[in-house]
Amino acid sequence: MAKENKKKRKRRRILLSLLMILFCGVILSTSTYAWFTANKTVTINDITVNVAAMNGLQISVDAINWKPTITTADIRGAQATYPTAVNQLPSELSSLSPVSSVGDIDTSTGFMQMYAGEIQTGTGGGNILTATRSTETHGENGNFIAFDVFIQTTALTQVYLTSNSRVTASGASSGIENAARIAFVNEGNAATGTAPTTIQQLKSTGTPAPFIWEVNNDVHTAAAVQNANSVYHQTTQQTDADPLEYYGVKADIGAGLDIPLDSQDGTYFEKVTPSASTGVDGIPTTAYQSLMQLQPGITKVRIYMWVEGQDVDCENNASGGSLTFSLQISSNTSADGA
């Protein structure tokens, strides 16, 4: 009898162990991780840049050849007449990886400082974030999109993002479009007639600060809602959500620092307040989004497009998605031509 009871206890222990393993398996399969720990890339399906020529507004990729609209082919081919161009546009066969930025400018180049992050296991066994500066190079590779445009105006002109400006999923949505950002850096202005080589070398001093646009801020997938709660300790919902605060990366983070994912340490992170934040319905046709005021002459603007790693929507289930970036700038305030 004692031997039989011992066997029963052993079977119960085995059953309990199996149940614990199954339970742990469920936890692991439903966990979400910021910055992607699985497939770390996002496919770029299309980049559409369209600038409407209204009230004397014209655009160029080299400050030489002016037209009402520029294409991705124009941007990729800019070095033919703008030899020092650094236009980083990953091809449709390439991909993006999450990066983070607070909008700081490297005044030696005029580039916005971007940081590529990676999740590692800390000395205590938990997940930590490491980050290294990711600087753009000319070509069809890179972690993010960056390119220069030149806008010519005949008078002081306020320009706007139209309702045709948006970031959407290509095909089935993974939710990664909800972590996208677009930024505009005013690199400087020169009088019409200034040598193109001089205009091409304009560099931002950091003032004015870059215009950072957060898109699709009011929708999240179920996994992103969980990520917000479990990693960043924020409560949100899948639709009609309030904008969530986030802390962008502003410095390199070494593995030995053991910086946790939810850190707000001011040495490495800074709260980002986007210049514009719009929901999934986008910019309304009745009221375009104010972008910047252009001085008469030629203004160099550097444009960035990226997946923000510190956004709650940047999590494993969203990796491998496909994005389309569309951009249209106008001097009109609405679709009715006002």
Feature map (PLM): residue ranges:
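Low-complexity, serine/threonine/proline-enriched polar segments
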Residues: 80-103, 183-267
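Short aromatic-acidic-glycine turn motif
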Residues: 54-61, 169-197, 334-337
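Short, polar/proline-rich extracytoplasmic segments that appear immediately after membrane translocation
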Residues: 3-94, 317-338
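N-terminal pilin/flagellin-like segments and related low-complexity appendage regions
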Residues: 63-134, 143-145
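Short, flexible loop/turn elements at secondary-structure junctions
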Residues: 48, 53, 153-155, 186
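C-terminal, structured domain-capping segment
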Residues: 38, 115-178, 224-338
